[in-house]
């Protein structure tokens, strides 16, 4: 059987936004009745990523978990925030014109680093469902990350489960 649903998360317009979606994913797996299979957590947004990581417990000065802040800091060195024209080739004049024709503010196009980071990390996580539970390891969590700092938005997280379900009266 295959089950699919979506959850919505709200992103900040000024900074990278992390959302712990573990509880929602576990709930959807539980409600599906899948005993053994896989779950895929996916973003169709090209400036977002889905990762598995442990909870750091400690908080940074920014209010993020320390591992989350470390990830942001590492990627700021690899793909710096778009702070000046010419830092990246994208967006070019055609991309800006396309955005304008589709009702987008040109400033929202200056999110090249978010596209690059999403491409490097990826936009999905696949985990095993074993005996009805998601195998994330002892300390694993699933995070949805919006790398786009140009505008706040409602983002969609897709959760797809596939596997063998318990049948009435046995397996």
Where are these regions (language model features)?
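Active-site histidine-anchored catalytic micro-motif
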Residues: 1-171
